[in-house]
Amino acid sequence: MTESVRLPVARLKPSTVALPGSKSISNRTLLLAALSDNACEIHSLLKSDDTDRMLEALDKLGVQIEYLAEDRLKVHGTGGRFPNRTADLFLGNAGTAFRPLTAALAVLGGDYHLHGVPRMHERPIGDLADALRIAGADVEYLGKEHYPPLHIGKRQDNGERVIPIKGNVSSQFLTALLMALPLTGQAFEIRMVGELISKPYIDITLKLMAQFGVQVANENYRVFKIPADAHYHAPEHLHVEGDASSASYFLAAGLIAATPVRVTGIGANSIQGDVAFARELEKIGADVVWGENFVEVSRPKERAVQSFDLDANHIPDAAMTLAIVALATGQTCTLRNIGSWRVKETDRIAAMANELRKLGAKVVEEAEAIHITPPKTLTPDAVIDTYDDHRMAMCFSLVSLLGVPVVINDPKCTHKTFPTYFDVFSSLTETTE
């Protein structure tokens, strides 16, 4: 029997939410710290399934990690060489662990088996494996061609220093390559083949690599140059920003409910691209206040939420939240250039279309777009399937602010990035039923 939670019709209270640490920053930071030549104390690390999978993997690879407090730990770097050259690594459905670890282990070489949950074995990795093979890596598919699970063997340096890679499926492939190639000590040039999607996630990678002492030359997101003799040296202390993707639910709530909501842990100088979500809300009726360590959204009650037609390539995760905001506009809304949704935790375009229809919305799906026309009145007590996708569960919680109760199946899927989400959400609302 699937566990579910019923969210009654609710009113949002003026609120401040302290965000959990960013998933994207947490897992990148853990790996970079593990590969550094010194120790790094990491503060405000996200505690979630995805970071747990990365920590378990690093432990199996022989990395010494001291747990100092619930959200603070010290990683003792390995100097760019994992002590354990043989390991069996289960990585769940954590793309931010699977892709970068694949690249790092392939570049270092050894005898490694990488696998995950069934959905991870449906998420493509062929473009990354192809690029690593050009660099001399031994990457073998143990199941379906171009998909996990993988076996990684010893790398032979073949002298190849120019690595082409496709960027139109997942920016994590480029992130993985960027983080791994400095471990060789050689100069490399990475050349993009076709379009690079989700560029803001590459910005996160490059900014974090710079904090760990490796400066990559970025030539207009077409060519990336890694210097020779690079090595990772960690800052003694590193503070993880709040998760900007997780912020989107609370910021959207402030817009939908015309009630001020402030999120702390991100701000005007955040390195995460998903902070741009607040700027998109501003275009459709929100008042946004930016601080150094907060973003606040509200809306005057007399101002309507506007419809939108948005190219969401720059905010693929936060854009899911806009699919729910569309229900508050009363008019057809469109999200474009979201093809990457198809290969995330689930096929998010199909899943979003299915569940919005349960609420009475008219939805037209395209390969890389979704068109949403809200109904005059939403269907109450719709039972929303979440497809083991944390973002589906968090998005659809907002329906309870639109005047109808909603039932969310498998609410614990939020443990991937935000285990306390439903507790936090209910603390911000008052039941009006």
UniProtKB/Swiss-Prot annotation:
Organism in which the protein naturally occurs: Neisseria meningitidis serogroup C / serotype 2a (strain ATCC 700532 / DSM 15464 / FAM18)
Superkingdom assignment: Bacteria
Family assignment from sequence similarity: Belongs to the EPSP synthase family.
Keyword Hydrolase: no
GO MF annotation list: 3-phosphoshikimate 1-carboxyvinyltransferase activity
Pathway the protein takes part in: Metabolic intermediate biosynthesis; chorismate biosynthesis; chorismate from D-erythrose 4-phosphate and phosphoenolpyruvate: step 6/7
The protein, known as: 3-phosphoshikimate 1-carboxyvinyltransferase
Lineage of producing organism: Bacteria, Pseudomonadati, Pseudomonadota, Betaproteobacteria, Neisseriales
Positions of the catalytic residues: 317
Main localization (coarse): cytoplasm
Keyword annotations of the record: Amino-acid biosynthesis, Aromatic amino acid biosynthesis, Cytoplasm, Transferase
Binding of 3-phosphoshikimate, residues: 23-24, 28, 170-172, 198, 317, 344
HAMAP family hit by this protein: EPSP_synth
Subcellular location: Cytoplasm
